[in-house]
Design a protein with these regions (language model features):
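Vicinal oxygen chelate
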Residues: 2-44, 50-59, 91-96, 112-181, ...
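Conserved beta-strand in the GNAT
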Residues: 101-104, 166
Length: 181
């Protein structure tokens, strides 16, 4: 396992305070489950049809296309001017299962690097087959992309603008072999 100090991926020495916090949080999680979680047959149907697209920011359209289409093999499906910001590019990649990953560039705006703040995207987890996972991991390493964290058949790494991504060889609707949908 690899990790970064100061990030949620750090897996170093565990302190007594962390053990105490985990024990406290486990009790909180159980209360939340009892209060809000319903068995599969008892849950209402979702009002959503799915994710239309998730939009991230790009500082360099060409570099973003080379990374997502060239390395991760997500086909570019459309590119046009952003309707909300003249001169801005809005472009889309197919990430499977009728889901799109979109990007904007905002020329002329002074945007800072990716930061983890409340309400922001922590990471985007994308499911692939085991064979594809090994293939894409090799392509990432060959391209010099650092694997930030690894656990079993899951790897975390950063995209061209620091966006945190996860590739995992686990079926949709499962997490650590456990159904989540």
């Amino acid at each position: 396992m690899r990790g970064e100090i100061g990030s949620c991926f750090y897996r170093g020495v565990v302190t007594e305070q962390q053990i105490k916090m985990e024990s406290t949080r486990a009790g909180e999680w159980e209360l939340l489950r009892q209060r809000h979680l319903r068995a599969e047959g008892e849950r209402p149907e979702s009002s959503a049809r799915g994710i239309h697209h998730l939009a991230l920011l790009s500082s360099d359209v060409e570099r973003t296309i080379e990374f997502y289409q060239g390395i991760l093999e997500f086909p570019l499906t459309e590119l046009f001017e952003n309707r909300d910001y003249l001169g801005s590019t809005h472009f889309f990649f197919d990430i499977g299962n009728d889901n799109a990953l979109a990007f904007f560039d905002f020329p002329g705006l002074d945007l800072g690097p990716y930061r983890e703040v409340l309400g922001s995207l922590h990471h985007l987890a994308i499911s692939v087959t085991s064979d594809r996972w090994h293939h894409l991991r090799s392509k990432l390493e060959a391209a010099g992309v650092e694997i930030v964290f690894e656990h079993a058949d899951s790897i975390y790494f950063n995209g061209p603008d620091g966006e945190r991504l996860e590739l995992l060889a686990e079926p949709l609707g499962e997490m650590n072999g456990r159904p989540v949908l």
